[in-house]
Amino acid sequence: MHRRTLVKPLLAALLAAAVLASCGKNATAPRPVDHSLRAVLGRTLTEHHLPAIAGAVVRSDSIAEIAVLGVRKLGAPDSVTLSDHFHLGSNVKAMTADLLAMEVEAGRLAWDRTLAQIFPEFADSMRVEYRGVTLEALLQHRSGLPAFTDPAELTAVPDFTGTLEERRQAAARWLLRQPPGGPVGQYLYSNAGYALAGVILERSAGASWESLIQTRLWAPLGIAGGFGWPAAGGAPQPWGHFDAGSGRLVPQDPDDPDGQFPDLLRPAGDAHLSVGDYARFARLHLRALRGHPELLSAATFQRLHTANGSYAMGWGVQPVGGATTWFHAGSAGTFGAIVMIQPGRDIAVVVLTNAGSNEAVLAAQDAAIELLAH
C-alpha cells in the first residue's frame, strides 16, 4: 500500500535542471533529429520507460499538434486515447487563481484585501502574522503559510465534520492559528495557501470550488474535467504510477483509501483533464498574454501573470531559450503535468504523463522545452 505524497513543489529545481540539460543538446547533434510532437513524445516514453505520455502544441488560433502514446497501466494492454484524462496536480493552482480573479472583477473581492478583512469573524484569533496578508500575496506563495507538501503534515489536521464547504471553513480557521512555515512576504510554496484560497472563493461566490470551476471556467472553454484519480471506481482511464525505488514505476490503485487526495486541499491541485482540454486552458492564457483575453479583462490577466520574483498567481515566470516563459509543473506523486507558454513566439506546450516520479516529471519538462525550441 502506497501513501503518495501531496502536490510537490517541483517548479524551480526541475525547470532549472531541464534548462541546463537542454542547453546545446540539439545544436551539435551528429544527425538530423525529428522534433515533431509524436517523435519527441515517443523518445521520452521509451528512454524513461513511462507508461504513457500525452502532449499538445498550441498556437493562439488553434491546437496545432496533439498526440498520446503508451498504455493506461503498466502490465495491462489498454492503450491511452486522446479522450483519456491525466491528473494535473499543482497545475490546478492557475485555475483557482482565475476563479478568484473573476470574484475580483465582480467587486466581491480585491487583490489588496487582507485575511483579517476576509475572515472578520475570527480575525482576532488568527495569528498576527497572517492578518495583513493580502489575497494577491496568498496566490503568490508569500503568505508564510506552511507548505503542506508532505502527507505527514496532514496528521495534525483535526477531523472536521459537516458539509465539504463547512469542513473547509473550519480547516481555514484552524490553519490560520498555526505557526507560519516561513517569513511572511518571502516566497514559500504552499498547498495550504491555495487550500485557503479555495475557501475564500467559496465564501465570496457562495458555491463550492468544484461547481465554480466547472461552470465558470471549464464549461465556457468546452472542457469536461473531473476530480480525484481518473481511474477511480473502475473507470476505463489511466492509472497513476509511483516510484517504488531505484526508478521502478508501480501502478497506484486509484481506489486505495491511503492514496486519496485530501478534499480540503483540492483547490491546490486535484483535477484531471484530457490533453486536449488542458491545451484549451493553456490557449486561454496564451491568447491573453498576446492581447486577446477571454473570460477576464486584459488588465486582470496582466495582474495574474505579473511575477513577484519568479512566481505570479498560479504561474512561474522565467526565461527559457531566451524567451520569457510562463510555466508550471504539477505532480501528486503518480502523474505529472507540464505547461509552458511563450507568448512572444505564439506557442504553448503541454505534456502529461501517468508517472509521478521526479525523473518522469523532469523528462516531461525536457520534452516540453524541446518542443518549444522547435
Stretches with model-predicted labels:
Residues 1-21:
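Sec-dependent bacterial lipoprotein signal peptides
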Residues 19-36:
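Bacterial Sec-dependent N-terminal signal peptides
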Residues 34-86, 110:
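Short, conserved catalytic-motif segment at the N-terminal edge
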Residues 38, 55, 61, 86-115, ...:
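Active-site SXXK
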Residues 62, 71-73, 126-333:
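Short, surface-exposed loop or secondary-structure junction motifs
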Residues 110-126, 220-221:
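Short, glycine/proline-biased beta-turn/loop segments that scaffold the active-site neighborhood
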Residues 321-324, 354-374:
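Short, gly/Ser/Thr-rich active-site loops of penicillin-recognizing serine hydrolases
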Residues 328, 336-355:
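Short, well-ordered beta-strand elements
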